[in-house]
Amino acid sequence: VFLLSEKPAASQHTRIYNNKNHYSSLVAKRTMPLTVTENVRKIVLENGLTVLTKEVHTAPVVTVQVWYKVGSRNEEPGANGIAHQLEHMMFKGTKNRPIQFGRLFSALGSDSNAFTSYDQTAYYGTVERDKLKALLVLEADRMQNSLINAEQLASEKRVVISELQGYENSPEYRLNRAVMQAAFPNHAYGLPVGGTKADVDRFQVEQVRNYYQNFYNPDNAVLVVVGDFKTANVLEIVKDVFGKLLNSQQSTVNSQRLTVNSQRLTVNRQQSIASTPIVLREPGAGQLLQVVYPLPDVNQPDVPALDVMDYILTEGRNSRLYQALVESGLANEVTAGVTSLRESGWYELLVTAAPSQKLKKIDSALSRAIANVVEKGIKAEEVKRAKTQLTADVILSNRDITSQAMQLGNDETTADDYRYTDRYLAAVSQVKEADVVAVIKKYLKKEARTVGFFEPTQKQFKEISDKPQSAQTTENFSLSTPELSSEVVKYLPPVAATDTITRVLPQQFTFANGLRVLLLPDKSTPTVTLSGYIEAGMEFDPADKAGLAAVVADNLMNGTKAKDILAIAKALEERGASLDFEAYREGVRIEGDSLAEDLPILLEILADVVRNSTFPVKELELNRQQTLTTLQLELDDPSEVAKRTFVQSIYPKKHPLHTFPTQESLEHISRKDVIDFKAKHYRPDTLVIALVGDFDLDKVRSLLQTKFGDWQVIGQPPKLKYPTVSLPEKIVHVNPVLPGKAQAITYMGYTGINRQDSRFHAALVLNQILGGDTLSSRLGAEVRDRQGLSYGIYSYFQAGKKVGTFLIEMQTSPEDTGKAIASTHQLLQQIHQQGVTAPEVETAKHTLISNYNVSLANPEELTDRILMNEVYELDTVELRSFTQKIQQVTLAQVNQAARELLHPDKIVVVTAGPAVLAEQRIK
């Protein structure tokens, strides 16, 4: 999937342990729902537009999505990436609204984006319910009236090439591209979804415009609307807004070509046997093994059994391939997935090798493990566990309305039936052991697979830095005049009066031992979301044992006094719940979720591992090797190297935040170090737990008291006081060079503010104007949209319990890096000296408030917000008063923040990736 823009991803989850105790104590035991389409209504307008609506009244928000039945599957050789290019062009304005649509979406406070995949291209936005009609009007406008001109295409082609070069930085991407082309040499499924630089360079405006007219028509689209509305009212609006649209005369010409593609695919499946592995010897860090097996299309009856097979093979620590490859020490990680599409599918396995292991040996072990399933069969409990995990994953992934709409849109465009997931879940429930063995025999044949090896030739990165320099640009890049907010207002569809939202506040409890708990019952779905925080982050790492805090967090689930690692994992996987610990600079974050009936088990495991973890030697050493491999991979990743170098350039050597793990520091960490750190920092008075979901408040409080109330420790928890850090006197450039990288990652910034700073809310408004959105901000409009220099550029105030950083992050082609940095620096100077405008402030405030309200409709984001408000020692009513504080920010306060918090001539500039020529730097 290729997004229009992308922000850093969230952490992964680890599967956790369950048992059958305590069900009746919190909720009545319920039958797991096997439908995601209840209350869905489908109509087809006279012009052929398919409309799906679903009322969900859990929060005053709605999502609008338009799915076009066109993706990379529809591309011919030489035009690879045109669907993705068109996706980008759809934000460049229409005949009626010649303005960047990102600015309109931002003004609505919409969480909007788009993506291109194999079978479809989708555009989606989630807003407060009073903005529903405005979103519908904008989507209808760009369905038929998009401006696609030569000047805009030239600029956006540079953005797309920047995006593609960013993917080229990843060895996984390069290996996958080679393997897929070999597996599907005669079908568009074998081409990269985003295209290639060579093809994108050749796109002509008429070519893209014809593609738009051909495929972007009502009879080739699905409109999905989910959220807080009345169906009859919405359908009237939809008929009025979309019913008048006409289909292009070109809209049906591609049906014959798609049939030809399908025939070619059938031939290819019998001819694309790779007898020897594809071997890539290129710059990189870790060794990789990828295997692809062809599979049937989404509507074939074997698909449910194939997904159950995948869970048995790779999901969790008890899975067959985890045991054969990771637990044995051959591999650092194994991931896999079944892809089921309109015309075909595939099963893809990706293995990251452990240090010094041979890929051929790993491949042999992989083949043996799969053959062993066929020869010896599988157990009924494995199938039962996989089916439970799979079904729970579907339910847990559909807690928010955006995800529910995504499920409907994907099913309707891929399987031609929005009810597909219901049928699929029913079929999954019927899968037996024999069915799983049968699909392995049928599809995972050694002669049918395509294999790829990635063998790295990487050398360690080297760092090029220079002395601080004076702050003048090498060229005077002229900045465009920002589009006036009056222009946004001119083209924005009418919006109804904004609703007043009254938020229910969580109940807060502090136990006698200092444990803080926040509980918010929410019966909208039969699920529970857990977030937690322990004051045991990487800031406490000893300088010579950097990485210790993360090692402790990573090993908590590896055994307790009562249960070993496999017993924990097995019991967890039986319920499809999740629990994950991840160390950050400030604190260890805990994330978990489960079906409501399994909350007692989730809390039982949480209590057991934070209180009774034993850190077995075998698992500790295996984790050390995995961590060393991960470090090796991170030092080949421009984003990770840029972040590490940026932080170490800001904070002096003796500062707690300067320390990062190295091979030497990780090798020096002993089991005693781990046990001592855990005993010192993991305490009830350093722990905060937040729960949101379907539970009885009093019973959960009682259960928490039972599990945690007798946890006693002595003394006071450790505290850190950071030394004061001065800004650099002048601009500092650092350029860590990584061989073989196509795209540069740049961080620009310095120390900033903490969450308690009185300027915090003004800083948020300032940041929204500066770089809060890659399409609508000053930086986005100038560097990305007008000049086409970056796929994505953002700014942040990272304000924590202690002073964090202000940073600007961008991705650029090496030849554009200097110009992008100089334009960014000049824009910082402009805002620092001249300030921003009153209309910009009002628009930014409205955007922040709307985004906040939309985000809290997602249970995970709501739980995290409740948790962190407590961690930052904010009043409980902050959940409700945040929007009022944003609304009260004035223009004078924002411009004062610009003068006090923007320091364009005292900035650290780190660019990781290809070498940046000295003459490109700010001087």
Kindly give the residue locations of the regions a language model identified:
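Classical Sec-dependent N-terminal signal peptides that target proteins to the secretory pathway
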Residues: 1-6
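Proteolytic maturation boundary segments
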Residues: 11, 16, 22-52, 230-254, ...
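Histidine-acidic residue clusters that define the catalytic metal-binding segment
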Residues: 27-41, 137-138, 163, 182-221, ...
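M16 family metallopeptidases and their MPP-like homologs
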Residues: 59-72, 81-85, 99-142, 174-198, ...
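Active-site His/Glu-centered metal-binding helix of metallohydrolases
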Residues: 82-90, 309, 551-552, 766
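Short, conserved secondary-structure transition motifs
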Residues: 161-167, 268-282, 386-397, 594-595, ...
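PPIase-associated folding chaperone regions across multiple families
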Residues: 304-307, 326, 761-764
